[in-house]
A protein has these predicted regions:
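Ser/Thr-rich, low-complexity intrinsically disordered terminal regions
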Residues: 16-127
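Sec-dependent N-terminal signal peptides
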Residues: 4-12
Length: 127
């Protein structure tokens, strides 16, 4: 019985990556500042911003939400001309009324400011 349970645990770790159980995820820091932006915003009511950000991302051209799990959202944005994919992550920390945003290019040394513009646009829609 113990072996069967252990086999189940091992198999389930491959089927369900740890990010699929995300709740109150601490977003990783930006390693390459030239193509990554990470910010934290304090808000009064965490529920309203979550829905606003989700709706904004759903309506953004060439952007698709690939994961929503609890207080974590991951979207992919594809550039219009070169078809580069950037990752946009949002984590909500309800106990502290903090929203963490992280936008990073997957390739290249510089994003020519695209990620900062994306985060600034999101922020302008929020506040």
């Amino acid at each position: 019985m113990k072996i069967l349970f252990l086999a189940f645990l091992i198999c389930s770790s491959f089927l369900f990556p740890s990010s699929s159980f995300a709740s109150h995820v601490e977003l990783k820091p930006c390693v390459e500042i030239a193509h990554c932006v990470r910010e934290e915003w304090e808000v009064n009511n965490i529920e309203k911003p979550f829905e606003e950000i989700k709706t904004f991302i759903e309506n953004t051209p060439r952007t698709k939400i690939v994961e929503i799990d609890g207080d974590y959202l991951h979207a992919e944005t594809t550039s219009k001309w070169m078809k580069y994919v950037d990752d946009l992550e949002v984590s909500f920390l309800p106990e502290s009324n903090i929203i963490s945003i992280r936008s990073e290019s997957r390739v290249g040394e510089s994003d020519l400011g695209v990620n900062q513009k994306r985060v600034d646009l999101l922020k302008s829609k929020m506040f």
